[in-house]
Amino acid sequence: MEENKRVRRKRYSGLYPKKYNEKYKEKNPEKYKETIQKVMKKGNTPAGMHRSIMVDEILHFFDIKLGQVGIDLTTGFGGHSKEILKKLNHTGHLHGIDQDPIELPKTRARLESYGFNKDNFTLHQLNFKDFDAIDTEGFDFILADLGVSSMQIDNPDRGFTFREEGPLDLRMNPNVGIPAYVRLLEMSEIEIEHMLIENADEIYAKEIAKEITKAKIQGRYIRTTLDLHQVIASALQKVSKKVYEEELKKASSRTFQALRIDVNSEYEVLFEMLDKLPGKLNPGGKVAILSFHSGEDRLVKKAFKQYLNDGVFSMTEGPILPSKEEVFNNPRARSAKLRIAIKG
């Protein structure tokens, strides 16, 4: 009888938390610089951090001149704003907008740590539909990145992801409106189905809407992200086992997207912002908008085409897609579409 060989314990690789309170070590960049480098080298985005998309393409198009005044309608982590401020080189002024009261103070501190101050930039806690309230005659360039920031996605307390347990909230500004779980309680089965189709082209819209309604009738309230994920999993039970996991992942992503768009009235807000664009652009002013799903892109495309036909814009171009290299280094860029325009 052969003796059992002693198996050497696998050495800790550093890629997962040794202690629970060290989960997502990347969120502590000062302490875990090597971990962050490993994550980014593999083409992933470190948890709690945001990697700005198509920065080079946007800066090339803007061709920023010293002394210009611009606005970043979706400041977020401040990645685009940082690079714009470097181009302005302590001249002119950059206004930044974000409706998120949790992340905005962090971004202000981040930009100040790079050496910029109130003479260089001003941050406003606003919904970008209200950007015309900023007291300035006009802007030389306007940027909008319509994607959800990684800081929001990677924070389970915000309820933007089905990968971790958290309250089903999904509000960009948690102080405004109602959380997603309340919204679901208010909606009928047909309203949920239409929302999923309209906001995310969800192919399992009927099944998911039916399962959500069934859960409500049975008193199984959908209050957390995992509650909703489990309901979606039940709705897809007839899907082939070979593709079930992948289909569940896609359906959950689309459902969360659709609900986020609904809760934040994103289409209505985008439409209002696009309507105000020409009036706030200086002659020869430039606008660049990054979108991440077909619904957003359709609205931007339609508005730009209309302004071009009306002679308001002298040129439009798009969609411009991120390079293969950028998509490899930052997978969250894969669905990005950039549209640009110049006011005549």
Swiss-Prot record:
Q: Which reaction does it catalyse?
A: cytidine(1402) in 16S rRNA + S-adenosyl-L-methionine = N(4)-methylcytidine(1402) in 16S rRNA + S-adenosyl-L-homocysteine + H(+)
Q: Which UniProt keywords apply?
A: Cytoplasm, Methyltransferase, rRNA processing, S-adenosyl-L-methionine, Transferase
Compartments, record wording: Cytoplasm
Q: Which domain of life is it from?
A: Bacteria
Cite a GO CC annotation.
cytoplasm
EC class of this enzyme?
transferase
Q: Which positions bind S-adenosyl-L-methionine?
A: G78, G79, H80, D98, F131, D145, Q152
Query: Could you tell me the Gene Ontology terms of the biological process aspect for this record?
Result: rRNA base methylation
Question: What EC number(s) has UniProt assigned to this enzyme?
Answer: 2.1.1.199
Against SUPFAM superfamilies, the record matches this protein to: Putative methyltransferase TM0872, insert domain, S-adenosyl-L-methionine-dependent methyltransferases
What InterPro entries does the annotation carry?
RsmH, SAM-dep_MeTrfase_MraW_recog, SAM-dependent_MTases_sf
Family affiliation: Belongs to the methyltransferase superfamily. RsmH family.
Function, as annotated, reads: Specifically methylates the N4 position of cytidine in position 1402 (C1402) of 16S rRNA.
Protein name, please?
Ribosomal RNA small subunit methyltransferase H 2
**Organism in which the protein naturally occurs:** Acholeplasma laidlawii (strain PG-8A)
User: Gene behind this chain?
Assistant: rsmH2
